[in-house]
Amino acid sequence: DTGKTIWEYKFNIFQSDVPPHRVAWASPAADPETGNVYALGAGATVIALSGDGKPLWQRSIGEEFAAFTTHGGRTMSPIIDGDLVIVSAAVSNWGTQAARSHRIIALNKRTGDIVYVSNPGGRPYDTAYAAPHIATINGTRLLIVGLGDGGIHAIKPQTGEKVWSFVAAKRAINTGVVVRGSTVIISHG
């Protein structure tokens, strides 16, 4: 009722190309079941905080998957589905994960352990910061999101299994989708 800050949690950004006036584009996600808050920072670090702002765990997607957020810290908002907190990032790694891609990464919301890594799209042209959306369409629960390859992709949020993709643009999709019944509405400009 007062507008006063209840708590604040600050953490370091270890990427030198992120200017201080553009420090990430994602909103945190609050979990109504646990009261916890999840954030994906400009350095591609996922942080879990209790409802009173105490750190529970953190995971560096930037270090583990070579995720990059580019100038300005373009990151997607995390989304919660059941026991998962799901994030996404453009990556370019070594070995079996060397191919540049835009991966969707699901973590156990209580422990931060990786549950799955999904790669539903093609090679990204840009990083993307579209908000993911979860909807049930024709009886199937889907996570639908625009990625850096210019496509809108639908996966099963509990398994990461790709259901469908639609290439909508030549560059990243940076707007969230709207779902009405069984219709997915996208915009890009």
Task: State the predicted function of each range.
Residues D1-G189:
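Noncatalytic, solvent-exposed loop/strand surfaces
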